Protein backbone atom coordinates (compact mmCIF):
# COMPACT_ATOMS: atom_id res chain seq x y z
CA UNK A 1 0.00 0.00 0.00
CA UNK A 2 1.29 3.42 -0.98
CA UNK A 3 0.41 4.94 2.40
CA UNK A 4 2.46 2.40 4.33
CA UNK A 5 5.33 2.57 1.85
CA UNK A 6 5.43 6.36 2.19
CA UNK A 7 5.68 6.08 5.97
CA UNK A 8 8.51 3.56 5.72
CA UNK A 9 10.43 5.42 3.01
CA UNK A 10 10.07 8.75 4.81
CA UNK A 11 11.29 7.33 8.11
CA UNK A 12 8.07 8.35 9.85
CA UNK A 13 7.43 6.39 13.02
CA UNK A 14 4.26 4.32 12.92
CA UNK A 15 2.69 1.25 14.46
CA UNK A 16 0.45 -1.21 12.64
CA UNK A 17 -2.48 -3.07 14.21
CA UNK A 18 -1.48 -1.77 17.62
CA UNK A 19 -3.66 -1.30 20.75
CA UNK A 20 -4.66 2.31 21.26
CA UNK A 21 -5.07 1.77 25.00
CA UNK A 22 -1.31 2.22 25.34
CA UNK A 23 -1.71 5.85 24.25
CA UNK A 24 -4.96 6.97 25.89
CA UNK A 25 -5.14 8.41 29.40
CA UNK A 26 -8.13 6.08 29.95
CA UNK A 27 -5.89 3.06 29.20
CA UNK A 28 -8.78 1.71 27.13
CA UNK A 29 -9.09 0.98 23.41
CA UNK A 30 -8.73 -1.68 20.74
CA UNK A 31 -6.29 -1.81 17.85
CA UNK A 32 -5.85 0.86 15.21
CA UNK A 33 -4.87 -0.07 11.68
CA UNK A 34 -2.14 2.57 11.92
CA UNK A 35 -0.89 4.88 14.65
CA UNK A 36 1.33 7.52 13.06
CA UNK A 37 3.74 9.96 14.74
CA UNK A 38 4.70 12.84 12.41
CA UNK A 39 7.49 15.09 13.68
CA UNK A 40 6.64 18.26 11.75
CA UNK A 41 3.62 20.05 10.35
CA UNK A 42 5.03 19.33 6.87
CA UNK A 43 4.92 15.59 7.57
CA UNK A 44 1.46 15.94 9.08
CA UNK A 45 0.11 17.61 5.94
CA UNK A 46 1.72 14.99 3.69
CA UNK A 47 0.28 12.14 5.76
CA UNK A 48 -3.21 13.63 5.78
CA UNK A 49 -3.10 14.31 2.05
CA UNK A 50 -2.04 10.77 1.22
CA UNK A 51 -4.59 9.22 3.58
CA UNK A 52 -7.32 11.28 1.96
CA UNK A 53 -6.15 10.40 -1.57
CA UNK A 54 -6.15 6.69 -0.69
CA UNK A 55 -9.53 6.90 1.07
CA UNK A 56 -8.04 5.78 4.38
CA UNK A 57 -10.11 6.85 7.35
CA UNK A 58 -8.12 9.04 9.71
CA UNK A 59 -8.44 10.98 12.93
CA UNK A 60 -5.94 13.53 14.20
CA UNK A 61 -5.41 13.35 17.96
CA UNK A 62 -3.13 14.91 20.52
CA UNK A 63 -2.41 13.29 23.87
CA UNK A 64 -5.60 11.16 23.74
CA UNK A 65 -6.57 12.63 27.11
CA UNK A 66 -10.19 13.38 26.27
CA UNK A 67 -11.20 10.33 24.25
CA UNK A 68 -12.84 6.95 24.66
CA UNK A 69 -11.70 4.45 22.04
CA UNK A 70 -13.95 1.53 21.15
CA UNK A 71 -12.97 -1.99 22.17
CA UNK A 72 -13.17 -2.76 18.45
CA UNK A 73 -10.45 -0.21 17.76
CA UNK A 74 -10.34 1.96 14.66
CA UNK A 75 -10.09 0.79 11.06
CA UNK A 76 -7.94 3.62 9.83
CA UNK A 77 -5.04 5.87 10.76
CA UNK A 78 -4.78 7.56 14.14
CA UNK A 79 -2.39 10.44 13.55
CA UNK A 80 -0.98 11.83 16.77
CA UNK A 81 0.65 15.24 16.97
CA UNK A 82 2.57 14.75 20.22
CA UNK A 83 5.97 14.97 18.50
CA UNK A 84 5.11 18.29 16.83
CA UNK A 85 5.66 20.11 20.07
CA UNK A 86 7.82 23.22 19.79
CA UNK A 87 6.77 26.57 21.24
CA UNK A 88 8.34 29.93 21.99
CA UNK A 89 7.56 32.89 24.22
CA UNK A 90 8.14 36.33 22.74
CA UNK A 91 7.17 39.10 25.12
CA UNK A 92 3.54 38.49 26.00
CA UNK A 93 2.93 36.27 22.95
CA UNK A 94 3.24 32.49 22.85
CA UNK A 95 3.43 30.61 19.56
CA UNK A 96 2.93 26.87 19.97
CA UNK A 97 2.71 23.94 17.60
CA UNK A 98 -0.29 21.63 17.73
CA UNK A 99 1.35 18.85 19.75
CA UNK A 100 2.89 20.98 22.48
CA UNK A 101 1.53 19.96 25.88
CA UNK A 102 -0.76 22.71 27.12
CA UNK A 103 0.21 22.20 30.76
CA UNK A 104 3.91 22.62 29.92
CA UNK A 105 3.30 25.73 27.81
CA UNK A 106 1.11 27.19 30.55
CA UNK A 107 3.68 26.56 33.29
CA UNK A 108 6.46 28.17 31.24
CA UNK A 109 4.19 31.17 30.69
CA UNK A 110 3.59 31.45 34.43
CA UNK A 111 7.31 31.19 35.13
CA UNK A 112 7.83 34.07 32.69
CA UNK A 113 5.45 36.23 34.73
CA UNK A 114 2.61 36.02 32.21
CA UNK A 115 -0.99 35.64 33.35
CA UNK A 116 -3.94 34.16 31.50
CA UNK A 117 -3.05 30.47 31.26
CA UNK A 118 -2.86 29.63 34.96
CA UNK A 119 -6.04 27.54 34.64
CA UNK A 120 -4.35 25.30 32.07
CA UNK A 121 -1.37 24.07 34.08
CA UNK A 122 -3.16 20.87 35.08
CA UNK A 123 -4.91 20.15 31.77
CA UNK A 124 -3.27 17.06 30.21
CA UNK A 125 -4.07 17.77 26.55
CA UNK A 126 -2.13 19.33 23.68
CA UNK A 127 -2.46 22.85 22.32
CA UNK A 128 -4.33 21.47 19.31
CA UNK A 129 -6.85 19.63 21.43
CA UNK A 130 -7.25 22.60 23.76
CA UNK A 131 -8.10 25.00 20.94
CA UNK A 132 -10.33 22.41 19.25
CA UNK A 133 -12.35 21.95 22.47
CA UNK A 134 -11.95 25.47 23.85
CA UNK A 135 -10.56 23.81 26.96
CA UNK A 136 -11.09 25.49 30.26
CA UNK A 137 -11.16 25.27 34.04
CA UNK A 138 -11.54 27.53 37.05
CA UNK A 139 -13.34 30.26 35.08
CA UNK A 140 -10.66 30.38 32.39
CA UNK A 141 -10.94 29.25 28.77
CA UNK A 142 -8.64 29.09 25.76
CA UNK A 143 -10.76 31.68 23.96
CA UNK A 144 -9.73 34.24 26.59
CA UNK A 145 -6.10 34.20 25.41
CA UNK A 146 -6.39 32.96 21.83
CA UNK A 147 -4.99 35.36 19.21
CA UNK A 148 -4.75 33.49 15.90
CA UNK A 149 -4.00 30.08 14.40
CA UNK A 150 -2.85 28.36 11.26
CA UNK A 151 -5.18 25.48 10.44
CA UNK A 152 -6.10 23.06 7.68
CA UNK A 153 -9.69 23.18 6.50
CA UNK A 154 -11.72 20.07 5.68
CA UNK A 155 -10.08 19.96 2.23
CA UNK A 156 -6.61 20.28 3.82
CA UNK A 157 -6.10 23.81 2.55
CA UNK A 158 -4.08 26.07 4.92
CA UNK A 159 -6.11 28.87 6.47
CA UNK A 160 -5.26 31.51 9.08
CA UNK A 161 -8.01 32.23 11.59
CA UNK A 162 -8.25 35.06 14.08
CA UNK A 163 -10.19 35.09 17.31
CA UNK A 164 -13.39 36.33 15.68
CA UNK A 165 -13.20 33.55 13.08
CA UNK A 166 -13.11 30.74 15.63
CA UNK A 167 -16.72 30.89 16.87
CA UNK A 168 -15.66 29.75 20.32
CA UNK A 169 -18.36 28.59 22.71
CA UNK A 170 -18.44 26.32 25.75
CA UNK A 171 -16.19 23.33 24.89
CA UNK A 172 -16.62 24.06 21.20
CA UNK A 173 -14.98 25.90 18.32
CA UNK A 174 -15.11 26.24 14.57
CA UNK A 175 -12.35 23.63 14.34
CA UNK A 176 -14.66 21.07 15.88
CA UNK A 177 -17.69 22.12 13.85
CA UNK A 178 -15.89 22.07 10.49
CA UNK A 179 -13.40 19.24 11.14
CA UNK A 180 -10.37 21.49 10.83
CA UNK A 181 -6.86 20.55 11.97
CA UNK A 182 -4.78 23.02 13.95
CA UNK A 183 -1.12 23.35 12.96
CA UNK A 184 -0.02 26.11 15.35
CA UNK A 185 -1.60 28.78 17.51
CA UNK A 186 -0.62 32.13 18.98
CA UNK A 187 -1.83 33.19 22.42
CA UNK A 188 -1.77 36.72 23.79
CA UNK A 189 -1.21 36.95 27.54
CA UNK A 190 -0.64 39.82 29.96
CA UNK A 191 2.27 40.62 32.22
CA UNK A 192 1.30 40.22 35.85
CA UNK A 193 1.25 43.41 37.90
CA UNK A 194 3.43 43.60 40.97
CA UNK A 195 0.38 43.64 43.26
CA UNK A 196 -1.13 40.54 41.61
CA UNK A 197 -0.79 37.04 43.00
CA UNK A 198 2.04 35.61 40.92
CA UNK A 199 0.81 33.51 37.97
CA UNK A 200 2.89 30.56 39.18
CA UNK A 201 1.39 30.74 42.67
CA UNK A 202 -2.11 30.88 41.20
CA UNK A 203 -1.36 27.91 38.92
CA UNK A 204 -0.01 25.91 41.86
CA UNK A 205 -3.18 26.65 43.83
CA UNK A 206 -5.29 25.32 40.94
CA UNK A 207 -3.09 22.22 40.76
CA UNK A 208 -3.52 21.64 44.50
CA UNK A 209 -7.28 21.97 44.14
CA UNK A 210 -7.25 19.41 41.30
CA UNK A 211 -5.30 16.91 43.39
CA UNK A 212 -7.72 17.33 46.27
CA UNK A 213 -10.95 17.03 44.27
CA UNK A 214 -10.19 14.86 41.24
CA UNK A 215 -9.35 11.13 41.06
CA UNK A 216 -5.94 11.67 39.47
CA UNK A 217 -4.52 8.35 40.68
CA UNK A 218 -6.75 6.39 38.27
CA UNK A 219 -6.81 6.37 34.46
CA UNK A 220 -9.62 8.52 33.11
CA UNK A 221 -10.50 10.99 30.38
CA UNK A 222 -11.18 13.87 32.73
CA UNK A 223 -14.66 15.33 33.03
CA UNK A 224 -17.00 13.05 31.11
CA UNK A 225 -19.83 15.55 30.63
CA UNK A 226 -20.11 19.21 29.79
CA UNK A 227 -21.33 21.45 32.56
CA UNK A 228 -25.10 22.06 32.22
CA UNK A 229 -26.23 25.71 32.49
CA UNK A 230 -26.34 26.83 36.13
CA UNK A 231 -25.42 23.39 37.41
CA UNK A 232 -22.67 20.78 37.72
CA UNK A 233 -22.67 17.38 36.05
CA UNK A 234 -20.86 15.74 38.95
CA UNK A 235 -23.37 17.03 41.50
CA UNK A 236 -26.33 15.88 39.39
CA UNK A 237 -24.82 12.40 39.02
CA UNK A 238 -24.11 12.24 42.74
CA UNK A 239 -27.64 13.41 43.58
CA UNK A 240 -28.97 10.69 41.27
CA UNK A 241 -27.30 8.18 43.60
CA UNK A 242 -24.62 7.00 41.20
CA UNK A 243 -21.42 8.00 42.99
CA UNK A 244 -19.25 4.88 43.21
CA UNK A 245 -21.47 2.89 40.84
CA UNK A 246 -19.47 0.27 38.99
CA UNK A 247 -19.93 -1.67 35.76
CA UNK A 248 -17.17 -4.14 34.95
CA UNK A 249 -13.84 -2.41 35.45
CA UNK A 250 -15.25 1.12 35.14
CA UNK A 251 -16.55 3.19 38.04
CA UNK A 252 -18.17 6.57 38.62
CA UNK A 253 -15.57 8.08 40.92
CA UNK A 254 -16.25 8.28 44.65
CA UNK A 255 -14.03 11.36 44.75
CA UNK A 256 -15.75 13.28 41.93
CA UNK A 257 -18.87 11.89 40.25
CA UNK A 258 -18.13 13.84 37.07
CA UNK A 259 -15.29 11.39 36.38
CA UNK A 260 -15.48 7.79 35.24
CA UNK A 261 -12.32 5.92 36.18
CA UNK A 262 -10.65 2.74 34.98
CA UNK A 263 -10.05 0.48 37.97
CA UNK A 264 -7.59 -1.57 35.96
CA UNK A 265 -9.43 -3.76 33.49
CA UNK A 266 -12.23 -1.55 32.17
CA UNK A 267 -13.60 -1.97 28.67
CA UNK A 268 -14.91 0.87 26.54
CA UNK A 269 -18.38 -0.69 26.70
CA UNK A 270 -18.26 -0.56 30.52
CA UNK A 271 -17.68 3.18 30.28
CA UNK A 272 -20.40 3.66 27.65
CA UNK A 273 -22.88 1.81 29.87
CA UNK A 274 -22.04 4.13 32.78
CA UNK A 275 -22.41 7.16 30.50
CA UNK A 276 -25.83 5.92 29.37
CA UNK A 277 -26.87 5.20 32.96
CA UNK A 278 -25.76 8.64 34.16
CA UNK A 279 -27.56 10.39 31.30
CA UNK A 280 -30.77 8.39 31.81
CA UNK A 281 -30.80 8.71 35.60
CA UNK A 282 -30.11 12.45 35.64
CA UNK A 283 -32.67 13.10 32.91
CA UNK A 284 -35.38 11.08 34.63
CA UNK A 285 -34.74 12.69 38.02
CA UNK A 286 -33.94 16.28 37.04
CA UNK A 287 -35.04 16.68 33.40
CA UNK A 288 -31.50 17.63 32.36
CA UNK A 289 -29.73 15.82 29.52
CA UNK A 290 -26.00 15.54 30.15
CA UNK A 291 -23.94 16.04 27.01
CA UNK A 292 -20.64 14.14 26.79
CA UNK A 293 -17.50 16.26 26.74
CA UNK A 294 -15.22 13.39 25.78
CA UNK A 295 -14.80 12.36 22.15
CA UNK A 296 -15.62 8.87 20.93
CA UNK A 297 -13.44 6.96 18.46
CA UNK A 298 -14.72 3.83 16.72
CA UNK A 299 -17.98 1.91 16.91
CA UNK A 300 -19.83 1.14 20.14
CA UNK A 301 -22.57 -1.33 21.03
CA UNK A 302 -24.01 0.84 23.80
CA UNK A 303 -25.76 3.99 22.54
CA UNK A 304 -25.89 7.36 24.20
CA UNK A 305 -29.16 8.10 25.97
CA UNK A 306 -31.81 9.84 23.87
CA UNK A 307 -34.94 11.11 25.68
CA UNK A 308 -38.28 10.00 24.29
CA UNK A 309 -39.32 13.64 23.86
CA UNK A 310 -36.05 14.33 22.02
CA UNK A 311 -35.08 17.41 24.03
CA UNK A 312 -34.26 18.68 27.49
CA UNK A 313 -37.25 19.31 29.68
CA UNK A 314 -35.30 22.14 31.28
Curated annotation (Swiss-Prot):
Gene3D superfamilies: 3.30.465.10, UDP-N-acetylenolpyruvoylglucosamine reductase, C-terminal domain, Uridine Diphospho-n-acetylenolpyruvylglucosamine Reductase, domain 2
Keywords, alphabetical: Cell cycle, Cell division, Cell shape, Cell wall biogenesis/degradation, Cytoplasm, FAD, Flavoprotein, NADP, Oxidoreductase, Peptidoglycan synthesis
Pfam families: FAD_binding_4, MurB_C
Cofactor(s) this protein requires: FAD
EC numbers on record: 1.3.1.98
Superkingdom assignment: Bacteria
Domain FAD-binding PCMH-type: start-end pairs: 27-192
Cellular compartment(s): Cytoplasm
Catalytic residues of the enzyme: 171, 223 (proton donor), 293
InterPro entries according to UniProt: FAD-bd_PCMH, FAD-bd_PCMH-like_sf, FAD-bd_PCMH_sub1, FAD-bd_PCMH_sub2, MurB, MurB_C, MurB_C_sf, Oxid_FAD_bind_N
Keyword Cell cycle: yes
A GO term for molecular function: FAD binding
Similarity-based family: Belongs to the MurB family.
Protein name: UDP-N-acetylenolpyruvoylglucosamine reductase
